[in-house]
Design a protein with these regions (language model features):
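Polar/acidic, low-complexity leader/linker segments enriched in S/T/G and N/D
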Residues: 1-4
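Conserved acetyl-CoA-binding loop-helix of GNAT-fold acetyltransferases
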Residues: 61, 182, 192-206, 227-231
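Conserved catalytic-core motifs of GNAT/GCN5-like acyltransferases
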Residues: 103-111, 235-250
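A conserved beta-strand-loop-helix scaffold within acyl/acetyltransferase catalytic domains
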Residues: 149-155, 161-179, 184-187
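Conserved beta-strand-loop-alpha-helix junction that forms the acyl-donor binding cleft
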Residues: 216-227, 235, 243-247
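Active-site rim helix/loop that mediates acceptor-substrate recognition in acyltransferases
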Residues: 137-155
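Conserved GNAT acetyl-CoA-binding A-motif
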Residues: 59-62, 178, 207-219
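Acyl-donor-binding surface of acyltransferase catalytic domains
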Residues: 6-131
Length: 250
């Protein structure tokens, strides 16, 4: 699905204030951040001091000009393949300290490698549109499926139901007009029945039909979630590091 990668490069170029050619080449790039139209608004801070992606074996930095210039001097020759390591996080924290910021998190992100759907046996499937999703606000069973954010609204969902009980929910948030992020919750009593894989693959296929790119993010250490992504037809495409104010991080 080469067209998906092309759309990814276009999206990352907007998010990181660079050219598509900068995403594709083999050099590290450092840009001053601007809030460009069409950017993903995933965990977006009011002011972006620094964020970094590792993609295609290289790095793209964007943020406040003074911070970016320090990063350029320190990381120009670093490999993207080995950058997302605790030792580099500590170096970034030292650079960010005077601004009152530090590394917040780093996640691997996945994009579709196929449009296949994995059926789930013995369950009822129900789909929800943006308006219908609102009934689940403040329902902590679905804290991964939905974010209820004005910046990245929840727009589509699919549930697995057994004996009139929702046992799994996958939701998609519109992080940008062309990239929707998928989240998933499954009742612990029903884990191991491939419900997560099925729901994520169904939502993936529905989003692709809208000519929008579904994507999936998780933690480095959440191996179960990474397995769900792989089984649902996703492959890892980039790693993203974001920063936040110290007072908000504790």
């Amino acid at each position: 699905m080469d067209y998906i990668k092309e759309k990814l490069y276009q999206q990352l170029a907007i998010d990181y204030c660079c050219q598509v050619s900068d995403i594709k080449d083999d050099k590290n790039h450092f840009t001053e951040y601007e809030k460009l139209k069409g950017r993903r608004q995933f965990e977006e801070a009011a002011d972006c001091v620094l964020k970094v992606i590792a993609v295609n074996g290289k790095l793209i930095f964007t943020g406040k000009k003074s911070i970016i210039e320090v990063c350029r001097k320190q990381f120009s020759n670093n490999s993207g393949n080995w950058f997302m390591d605790a030792s580099n996080f500590r170096k970034l924290d030292e650079i960010l300290m005077n601004e009152g910021y530090r590394v917040k998190t780093a996640h691997p992100f996945f994009i579709p490698k196929d449009d296949c759907v994995h059926e789930i046996n013995g369950v009822e499937i129900k789909k929800y549109n943006q308006e219908e999703i609102l009934q689940f606000k403040d329902d902590d069973r679905f804290d991964e499926a939905f974010c209820f954010s004005e910046e990245s609204p929840d727009v589509l969902a699919v549930a697995a139901i057994i004996d009139d009980e929702i046992v799994g929910m996958a939701g998609a948030s519109a992080d940008s007009p062309s990239f929707w992020q998928i989240g998933i919750n499954v009742n612990k009593n029903f884990e191991g029945r491939h419900i997560a894989t099925g729901l994520v693959s169904m939502l993936k296929a529905d989003i692709l039909k809208k000519e929008i790119v579904p994507y999936y993010g998780t933690s480095f250490s959440n191996l179960a979630s990474q397995h769900v992504a792989a089984k649902a037809g996703f492959e890892v495409a980039w790693v993203e590091l974001i920063t936040g104010r110290m007072e908000f991080l504790g």
